[in-house]
Amino acid sequence: MADPATSSPLLDDHVGGEDERGRRSRSSTLVQKVIDVEEAKAQMIYSLPMILTNVFYYCIPITSVMFASHLGQLELAGATLANSWATVSGFAFMVGLSGSLETLCGQGFGAKRYRMLGVHLQSSCIVSLVFSILITIFWFFTESIFGLLRQDPSISKQAALYMKYQAPGLLAYGFLQNILRFCQTQSIIAPLVIFSFVPLVINIATAYVLVYVAGLGFIGAPIATSISLWIAFLSLGTYVMCSEKFKETWTGFSLESFRYIVINLTLSLPSAAMVCLEYWAFEILVFLAGVMPNPEINTSLVAICVNTEAISYMLTYGLSAAASTRVSNELGAGNVKGAKKATSVSVKLSLVLALGVVIVLLVGHDGWVGLFSDSYVIKEEFASLRFFLAASITLDSIQGVLSGVARGCGWQRLVTVINLATFYLIGMPIAAFCGFKLKFYAKGLWIGLICGIFCQSSSLLLMTIFRKWTKLNVATV
């Protein structure tokens, strides 16, 4: 007979092991009730490469501006103004136009109509070609437009010069965005990191050579941007045409793409409006800050907040792309339940992501604002703004994901109406009232923005919950 003194511990260990496994099982079940773990893992794995890709492409024009800014104060002001104007009047529009492919290619891939992805890509590139030509013509009147906006004549002249040499890169950027959506909707994303990082490195080297070694000075920076964007487009385009991964979705150039231009426009124009309406709202805040009392302080504060929001949104962009792809693929396959599950997971992940960003901001706000300014006044004012900024970042994270869902579903027109109403009929009037009438200044402007984003997020959420989810019929778009 076994000695109880030696047998009991073995029994206790066995029971303890069962208890431990039971606790783990209950914990796992609890987590599974809150969020689908496998879906969350898939979306996070998808999001990271998209975040890196977005950051690398975003940094191409920014690094060129940095090289130009070291030539003097006038060059800094001109390059910064030009880059801001190019973004809101051209690059953002091109990003928006490519949003049609998130619907058409995403649902087409889910429906296993693989050949049509290449057709829709070509159709979207034709649309981008036309609009890039129109925008480039518009850009040649930059100096006159800045004059009408009461900008400093010398800065306006420098900005117009910068735009002139950056204009050739716009078409390449438009084509590039279309190819990115084409790859994104097929979940072929890992190579995008390499194809975005290499052009960034090339841009840094090219800008240095053109600005300092070749002696081109100021115009060398925008020329470098244009060259790098063309390299980015041509390299990624060559990869798509030659890689075996796309043998079913890219079957060569086809005249059939012209038949789908109108269908593309019905989605791409509202998608572009979605993006631009939001971009313009932030630029309007900076403009309003500039006409307030003590414009240096107020403009600096709003600009820091806008840049912080933009950097935060780069993280959200990855989740937005994941949500758009998962939803469009599932709807294309006729799986509405799967699309809704993916949406639920995306929204929950957006809240977790926003919480992480907000914690970092609230804890390290002094160090963060110190990267932008050494002014004690600006640091103090930013400290009082940080909770408002935290609120806007959280709401923007939610709306970013819901906007991705909307693109996947083909709801671009409805979202355009929502953005127009919430930002320009609610947010901006409240911003002007709080900023000027109540004399809250920069804080008042941000309160108005929060009101706009809150109404936008709420509207998108209600639309997502109550609107009927159906597969897009391209014949009736």
From Swiss-Prot:
Its main location: membrane. Expressed in the root epidermis and cortex. Not expressed in hypocotyl. Detected in the elongation zone of young roots, but not in the meristematic region. It holds the Pfam family MatE. CDD domains: MATE_eukaryotic. GO terms for cellular component: membrane. The chain crosses the membrane at residues 48-68, 76-96, 129-149, 161-180, 188-208, 213-233, 260-282, 301-321, 352-372, 382-402, 414-434, 446-466. Disruption phenotype: Aberrant lateral root formation due to hypersensitivity to toxic compounds. Residues 11-22 have a biased composition (Basic and acidic residues). It is a multi-pass membrane protein. Keywords: Membrane, Transmembrane, Transmembrane helix, Transport. InterPro entries: MATE_euk, MATE_fam. It is found in: Membrane. Required for protection of the roots from inhibitory compounds. When expressed in a heterologous system, confers resistance to tetramethylammonium chloride. NCBIfam families: matE (TIGR00797). This is Protein DETOXIFICATION 19. It comes from Arabidopsis thaliana.
